[in-house]
Amino acid sequence: MPLTLSTGKHDMTLDPVWTNAAGMLGFSNEARDLVDLSRLGAMVTNPVSLAPRSPARGPRMLEFPGGFLLHTGHPNPGLTEVLRRHRRRWARMPCPVIVHLLAQTPEEVGRMAERLEAVEEVAAIELGLGETDPQTVAAMVTAAGASQRPIIAHLPLGSGAQLAQAAARAGAAAIALGAPRGALPDPGGAIVHGRLYGHAMLPTALQAVTQLARLVDCPLIAGGGITSRQAAEAMLAAGAAAIQFDSVLWTEPEAVLESPTA
Protein backbone atom coordinates (compact mmCIF):
# COMPACT_ATOMS: atom_id res chain seq x y z
CA MET A 1 0.00 0.00 0.00
CA PRO A 2 1.16 3.59 -0.59
CA LEU A 3 3.26 5.41 2.00
CA THR A 4 2.45 9.04 2.76
CA LEU A 5 5.00 11.23 4.56
CA SER A 6 3.59 14.44 6.00
CA THR A 7 4.77 17.49 7.89
CA GLY A 8 1.37 19.15 8.19
CA LYS A 9 2.29 21.64 5.47
CA HIS A 10 3.71 19.36 2.76
CA ASP A 11 2.83 15.74 1.98
CA MET A 12 4.55 13.22 -0.26
CA THR A 13 3.10 9.86 -1.22
CA LEU A 14 5.19 6.95 -2.45
CA ASP A 15 3.07 4.84 -4.78
CA PRO A 16 4.57 2.34 -5.47
CA VAL A 17 6.57 2.14 -2.28
CA TRP A 18 10.06 2.17 -3.75
CA THR A 19 12.69 4.61 -4.88
CA ASN A 20 16.25 4.44 -6.08
CA ALA A 21 19.04 4.99 -3.60
CA ALA A 22 20.95 8.26 -3.84
CA GLY A 23 23.88 8.06 -6.23
CA MET A 24 22.30 5.49 -8.55
CA LEU A 25 20.37 7.51 -11.16
CA GLY A 26 21.85 11.00 -11.34
CA PHE A 27 20.29 14.35 -10.48
CA SER A 28 17.17 14.19 -12.66
CA ASN A 29 16.47 12.21 -15.82
CA GLU A 30 20.01 11.18 -16.82
CA ALA A 31 19.17 7.48 -16.39
CA ARG A 32 15.85 7.52 -18.26
CA ASP A 33 17.20 5.07 -20.85
CA LEU A 34 18.22 2.66 -18.08
CA VAL A 35 15.19 2.84 -15.79
CA ASP A 36 11.59 3.83 -16.51
CA LEU A 37 11.25 6.53 -13.85
CA SER A 38 7.44 6.34 -13.96
CA ARG A 39 7.76 2.95 -12.25
CA LEU A 40 9.35 4.55 -9.16
CA GLY A 41 7.37 6.00 -6.29
CA ALA A 42 9.94 8.81 -6.22
CA MET A 43 13.37 9.56 -7.62
CA VAL A 44 16.17 10.37 -5.15
CA THR A 45 18.88 12.64 -6.54
CA ASN A 46 22.59 12.09 -6.27
CA PRO A 47 23.98 13.69 -3.10
CA VAL A 48 24.00 17.50 -3.29
CA SER A 49 26.33 19.64 -1.16
CA LEU A 50 26.28 23.37 -0.52
CA ALA A 51 29.59 23.92 -2.35
CA PRO A 52 30.88 21.94 -5.34
CA ARG A 53 32.71 18.67 -4.69
CA SER A 54 35.30 17.05 -6.95
CA PRO A 55 35.52 13.31 -7.66
CA ALA A 56 37.62 11.18 -5.35
CA ARG A 57 41.12 10.24 -6.44
CA GLY A 58 42.27 6.69 -6.90
CA PRO A 59 40.21 3.56 -7.56
CA ARG A 60 36.45 4.17 -7.72
CA MET A 61 35.25 0.56 -7.53
CA LEU A 62 36.72 -2.55 -5.91
CA GLU A 63 34.99 -5.93 -6.08
CA PHE A 64 34.67 -8.55 -3.37
CA PRO A 65 32.64 -11.79 -3.25
CA GLY A 66 28.97 -10.82 -3.30
CA GLY A 67 29.42 -7.13 -3.96
CA PHE A 68 31.66 -4.16 -4.49
CA LEU A 69 33.01 -1.07 -2.76
CA LEU A 70 32.26 2.29 -4.36
CA HIS A 71 34.43 5.33 -3.63
CA THR A 72 33.37 8.45 -5.54
CA GLY A 73 33.72 11.43 -3.22
CA HIS A 74 30.10 12.36 -4.05
CA PRO A 75 31.06 14.76 -6.87
CA ASN A 76 28.46 17.41 -7.59
CA PRO A 77 28.41 21.04 -8.75
CA GLY A 78 26.83 22.40 -5.56
CA LEU A 79 23.23 23.27 -4.74
CA THR A 80 22.99 26.48 -6.77
CA GLU A 81 24.22 24.83 -9.95
CA VAL A 82 22.12 21.70 -9.41
CA LEU A 83 19.02 23.87 -9.17
CA ARG A 84 19.99 25.81 -12.28
CA ARG A 85 20.57 22.68 -14.34
CA HIS A 86 17.84 20.39 -13.06
CA ARG A 87 14.90 22.31 -11.60
CA ARG A 88 13.03 22.50 -14.91
CA ARG A 89 13.68 18.81 -15.50
CA TRP A 90 12.25 17.99 -12.07
CA ALA A 91 9.03 19.72 -13.06
CA ARG A 92 8.67 17.28 -15.97
CA MET A 93 9.60 14.13 -14.05
CA PRO A 94 7.02 11.31 -14.03
CA CYS A 95 7.44 10.83 -10.27
CA PRO A 96 8.12 13.01 -7.21
CA VAL A 97 11.68 14.21 -6.63
CA ILE A 98 13.54 13.78 -3.34
CA VAL A 99 16.74 15.82 -3.02
CA HIS A 100 19.50 14.07 -1.08
CA LEU A 101 21.50 16.60 0.94
CA LEU A 102 25.13 16.07 1.86
CA ALA A 103 26.23 18.46 4.62
CA GLN A 104 28.97 18.71 7.21
CA THR A 105 27.22 20.88 9.80
CA PRO A 106 23.68 21.77 10.92
CA GLU A 107 24.29 25.28 9.58
CA GLU A 108 24.90 23.89 6.08
CA VAL A 109 21.80 21.73 6.35
CA GLY A 110 19.70 24.70 7.40
CA ARG A 111 20.94 26.89 4.55
CA MET A 112 20.21 24.24 1.94
CA ALA A 113 16.86 23.26 3.42
CA GLU A 114 15.71 26.87 3.56
CA ARG A 115 16.68 27.28 -0.08
CA LEU A 116 14.72 24.18 -1.08
CA GLU A 117 11.59 25.35 0.73
CA ALA A 118 11.05 27.76 -2.17
CA VAL A 119 11.50 25.02 -4.79
CA GLU A 120 8.06 23.57 -5.37
CA GLU A 121 9.42 20.80 -7.59
CA VAL A 122 11.02 19.16 -4.53
CA ALA A 123 8.67 16.76 -2.75
CA ALA A 124 10.93 15.82 0.16
CA ILE A 125 14.49 15.97 1.46
CA GLU A 126 16.69 13.00 2.22
CA LEU A 127 19.45 13.90 4.64
CA GLY A 128 22.60 11.83 4.39
CA LEU A 129 23.97 11.08 7.86
CA GLY A 130 27.16 9.28 8.80
CA GLU A 131 28.08 7.08 11.73
CA THR A 132 28.10 9.86 14.30
CA ASP A 133 26.40 10.46 17.66
CA PRO A 134 22.71 10.96 18.54
CA GLN A 135 23.19 14.64 19.40
CA THR A 136 24.67 15.42 15.98
CA VAL A 137 21.95 13.44 14.20
CA ALA A 138 19.25 15.32 16.11
CA ALA A 139 20.84 18.69 15.32
CA MET A 140 21.12 17.88 11.61
CA VAL A 141 17.52 16.67 11.33
CA THR A 142 16.24 19.67 13.28
CA ALA A 143 18.12 22.01 10.94
CA ALA A 144 16.61 20.28 7.91
CA GLY A 145 13.19 21.20 9.27
CA ALA A 146 13.76 24.71 7.91
CA SER A 147 12.32 23.40 4.65
CA GLN A 148 9.01 22.15 6.09
CA ARG A 149 9.24 19.33 3.55
CA PRO A 150 9.15 15.73 4.81
CA ILE A 151 12.64 14.79 5.99
CA ILE A 152 14.01 11.31 5.40
CA ALA A 153 17.02 10.62 7.62
CA HIS A 154 19.36 8.32 5.69
CA LEU A 155 21.66 6.21 7.84
CA PRO A 156 24.25 3.61 6.80
CA LEU A 157 23.54 0.04 7.85
CA GLY A 158 25.16 -0.69 11.18
CA SER A 159 24.64 2.79 12.61
CA GLY A 160 22.70 1.49 15.59
CA ALA A 161 19.25 2.06 16.98
CA GLN A 162 20.21 5.16 18.97
CA LEU A 163 20.87 7.19 15.82
CA ALA A 164 17.60 6.15 14.22
CA GLN A 165 15.70 6.97 17.40
CA ALA A 166 17.41 10.36 17.65
CA ALA A 167 16.42 11.18 14.07
CA ALA A 168 12.81 10.16 14.68
CA ARG A 169 12.57 12.22 17.87
CA ALA A 170 14.02 15.24 16.03
CA GLY A 171 11.21 15.14 13.49
CA ALA A 172 12.28 12.83 10.67
CA ALA A 173 9.25 11.65 8.72
CA ALA A 174 11.04 8.40 7.87
CA ILE A 175 14.32 6.57 8.40
CA ALA A 176 16.12 5.17 5.36
CA LEU A 177 18.80 2.52 5.74
CA GLY A 178 21.40 2.17 3.03
CA ALA A 179 24.87 1.11 2.00
CA PRO A 180 27.22 0.55 4.94
CA ARG A 181 30.77 1.83 4.98
CA GLY A 182 33.69 -0.48 4.48
CA ALA A 183 37.30 -0.68 3.32
CA LEU A 184 39.31 -2.82 0.90
CA PRO A 185 42.91 -2.83 -0.31
CA ASP A 186 43.45 -1.63 -3.86
CA PRO A 187 45.78 -3.52 -6.25
CA GLY A 188 48.72 -1.58 -4.84
CA GLY A 189 47.87 -2.38 -1.24
CA ALA A 190 46.49 1.04 -0.25
CA ILE A 191 43.31 0.97 1.84
CA VAL A 192 40.28 2.43 0.07
CA HIS A 193 37.20 3.44 2.07
CA GLY A 194 33.74 3.62 0.56
CA ARG A 195 30.17 2.34 0.44
CA LEU A 196 29.38 -1.35 0.07
CA TYR A 197 26.83 -2.67 -2.42
CA GLY A 198 25.65 -6.07 -3.61
CA HIS A 199 23.54 -9.01 -2.53
CA ALA A 200 25.98 -9.82 0.28
CA MET A 201 24.52 -6.85 2.19
CA LEU A 202 21.04 -8.42 2.42
CA PRO A 203 21.41 -10.39 5.69
CA THR A 204 22.73 -7.32 7.52
CA ALA A 205 20.01 -5.10 6.06
CA LEU A 206 17.21 -7.54 6.89
CA GLN A 207 18.45 -7.90 10.45
CA ALA A 208 18.61 -4.12 10.87
CA VAL A 209 15.06 -3.62 9.59
CA THR A 210 13.72 -6.40 11.82
CA GLN A 211 15.26 -4.78 14.89
CA LEU A 212 14.52 -1.13 14.10
CA ALA A 213 10.89 -1.75 13.16
CA ARG A 214 10.24 -2.43 16.85
CA LEU A 215 12.22 0.54 18.11
CA VAL A 216 11.33 3.61 16.03
CA ASP A 217 8.00 5.37 15.70
CA CYS A 218 8.29 6.38 12.06
CA PRO A 219 8.35 4.45 8.78
CA LEU A 220 11.48 2.58 7.73
CA ILE A 221 12.73 2.66 4.15
CA ALA A 222 14.89 -0.41 3.63
CA GLY A 223 17.97 -0.54 1.45
CA GLY A 224 21.06 -2.65 0.99
CA GLY A 225 21.41 -5.91 -0.88
CA ILE A 226 17.90 -5.92 -2.37
CA THR A 227 18.42 -7.46 -5.78
CA SER A 228 15.20 -9.45 -6.27
CA ARG A 229 11.48 -9.26 -5.74
CA GLN A 230 11.81 -11.93 -3.06
CA ALA A 231 14.27 -9.77 -1.11
CA ALA A 232 11.95 -6.76 -1.39
CA GLU A 233 9.03 -8.79 -0.07
CA ALA A 234 11.17 -10.03 2.82
CA MET A 235 11.99 -6.44 3.78
CA LEU A 236 8.33 -5.45 3.77
CA ALA A 237 7.45 -8.51 5.84
CA ALA A 238 10.19 -7.57 8.33
CA GLY A 239 8.62 -4.16 8.92
CA ALA A 240 9.85 -1.84 6.19
CA ALA A 241 7.29 0.59 4.81
CA ALA A 242 9.18 1.22 1.57
CA ILE A 243 12.24 0.06 -0.37
CA GLN A 244 15.31 1.72 -1.90
CA PHE A 245 17.01 -0.12 -4.74
CA ASP A 246 20.68 0.55 -5.41
CA SER A 247 23.11 -1.23 -7.74
CA VAL A 248 20.48 -3.64 -9.09
CA LEU A 249 19.13 -0.68 -11.08
CA TRP A 250 22.42 -0.65 -13.02
CA THR A 251 22.38 -4.34 -13.84
CA GLU A 252 18.88 -5.82 -13.76
CA PRO A 253 16.14 -3.24 -13.01
CA GLU A 254 13.42 -5.54 -14.31
CA ALA A 255 14.20 -7.96 -11.48
CA VAL A 256 12.85 -5.53 -8.90
CA LEU A 257 10.53 -3.07 -10.62
CA GLU A 258 7.48 -5.22 -10.06
CA SER A 259 4.99 -4.68 -7.30
CA PRO A 260 6.03 -6.62 -4.20
CA THR A 261 3.24 -7.92 -1.99
CA ALA A 262 2.68 -5.28 0.69
Feature locations, PLM:
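Acidic (Asp/Glu)-rich catalytic clusters
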Residues: 35-38, 85-94, 113-121, 140-146, ...
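Hydrophobic faces of well-ordered beta-strands that scaffold small-molecule active sites
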Residues: 16-22, 41-45, 97-101, 123-127, ...
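Glycine-rich phosphate-binding active-site loops on the catalytic face of alpha/beta enzymes
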Residues: 45-50, 123-131, 174-185, 225-259
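N-terminal capping/small domains of soluble enzymes
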Residues: 1-94
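Alpha-helix-loop-beta-strand connector modules within alpha/beta enzyme cores
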Residues: 69-96, 137-159, 193-220, 258-262
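Catalytic cores of alpha/beta
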Residues: 29-35, 109-118, 158-171, 211-222, ...
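Active-site beta->alpha loop and helix N-cap motifs at the rims of alpha/beta catalytic domains
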Residues: 65-135
